[in-house]
Amino acid sequence: EPIEEDRFVGGDIYEVVQSPYGTRVIIGDVQGKGLPAIGAGFAAIAAFREAAVREPTLTGVVEALEDAVVRHNVFSAQTGEAERFVTALILGFDEGGDVQAVNCGHLPPRLLHEGRASAVPLDRTSVPLGLAGLSRESRAEESFALPPEATLLVVTDGVTEARDAARDFYPFDQRLGDWAGHGPRELLDALHVDLEKFTGGVRRDDVAALALRRAPGDGRPRPTAAAEEARPVAGAVSD
């Protein structure tokens, strides 16, 4: 139930796709701002929408994303624009209780379950999209459990790097501990209100947040998203 239909928010991107291989999700952050960043974001989103339903493996989806960002950068260089990279977390949900993940330099997801909140330990974090040529290691898929009634929260660094008037960082994980019993929509609403209060309404980066919970019975995740450009909405904000 996305609150905002636009899946590209300033420098942040997110999308949820139902595929023959299960539900696939991306959340990401494009380096930089302005029209060049928007172009790289659109390239990544378009590639994800196609590859998510075509590629049987999550690493295949990520390879398609890498190719798309690299092609975009080649075109950008020819037109005198700076090259861009994209941090991204790509998730796959099947009929079982596990989640597959490929982390391309993005923040790890947070798991809220049974009154506790914790970061999901992902050990194979790789370089951002567009930079695979600089790494000797290939990207690898990991998996972790998503128990029934648990909520998985993924955000961009506009949340974790938000600052107050004293230049202190937003205490993201501390707040999640206070909200560990919330459902997806209630969680995003609380995050939005608290970010507004903490920053005094002054933010210097885009913000996107996506809360996912498996729908009862079919094993598929039910996403709740919040993201908007320039002004706040219930759940998350973006500047």
Predicted segments, located by residue:
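Short alpha-helical "switch" segments that flank and position catalytic residues
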Residues: 21-28, 35-44
